[in-house]
Amino acid sequence: MKKVLALMVAATLGLSSVAFAADTTATATPAATSTTATVAAQTKATQHQKHKVTKKTTEQKAQAAKKHEKKASVQKTPVQKAQAAKKHVKKASVQKAPVQKAQAAKKHHKTAKKPVAAPAA
């Protein structure tokens, strides 16, 4: 355990001579108490850096979400479909075939009235 703590301190400080000095049992005990304090301080420092990194990633996600919202608001295809529907409604209202049939029916009624009037005279 003492060697592991000494190696952790050596790795964080970048000093290989500290690991070799920790092999002696007399210096390992005081070094262990100081290493736990330094390791705890360094882990707190790294945790703060991790929080900063996560904040940057959330900002990037927010920018990507904004881009997606712009794409959703640009869609104009439903408006085009509505215009096409309006054109179909105009075609349906233009039909005058029933009016022509009514005029033809009126002509038939007139011809029917003439023969009825002729025998009565």
Swiss-Prot record:
Disulfide bonds: none annotated. It comes from the Bacteria. Residues 84-93, 104-113 have a biased composition (Basic residues). InterPro entries: Acid_shock. Keywords: Periplasm, Signal. Residues 22-63 form a propeptide. Residues 94-103 have a biased composition (Low complexity). Residues 1-21 form the signal peptide. Residues 40-121 are annotated as: Disordered. One of its GO terms (cellular component) is periplasmic space. The keyword Signal applies. Proteolytic processing gives rise to the active protein. It is found in: Periplasm. Required for growth and/or survival at acidic conditions. Belongs to the Asr family. This is Acid shock protein 2. The gene is asr2.
